């Protein structure tokens, strides 16, 4: 079969066929070559303030602290990689649970946390979390090692936002730092920007990459 392009048409044998159709026929025979398979593995995390291990999920929860430097944040190591890598994690609200306040109808809280993922002086992403607490069913997990009933900590993750951050080639670590927290409760609203304050927690840190 011989084909000759003629403007908007192709000559296939003795028939003129619209070029779009012919291009479609060509594409049907294209073999797509996929890149080398990547790897996904748990991230190596340097956590300056560990909340603890979740009793339900088994995830390690790390506090996100307000900071002005990358060194003050949660450091996630990125293995040597070909092309861009991807760091993923779940960003949760940080709620202090009180069964008494919840029973009295005064446990409601709304959290708006603004964070940043940085590599050196470059901001790669600004993840934002909006989470609400109404009752105990809103808690994602509970953390052991506390003085509360059954040895539970009062602080627990609430809500959750799945975050994916693209990491450029040549970058071997990123830092997750807090910027601002806005909390709304039944008795008012507060905004926190003081360095060192915990404003959220992260868990389930993973790194996706292709080895060099």
Which residues are covered by each model-predicted region?
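Extended, solvent-exposed segments with strong compositional bias
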Residues: 125-166, 183
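N-terminal leader/pro-regions and domain N-caps
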Residues: 38-68
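Contiguous beta-strand segments within globular domains
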Residues: 78-103
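Bacterial N-terminal signal peptides
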Residues: 19-31
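Noncatalytic modules at the cell exterior or secretory-pathway interfaces
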Residues: 82-87, 165-182
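Exposed low-complexity, polar/acidic, P/S/T/G-rich flexible segments that act as propeptides
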Residues: 181-212
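Short coil-to-beta strand junction motifs in C2/discoidin
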Residues: 101-113
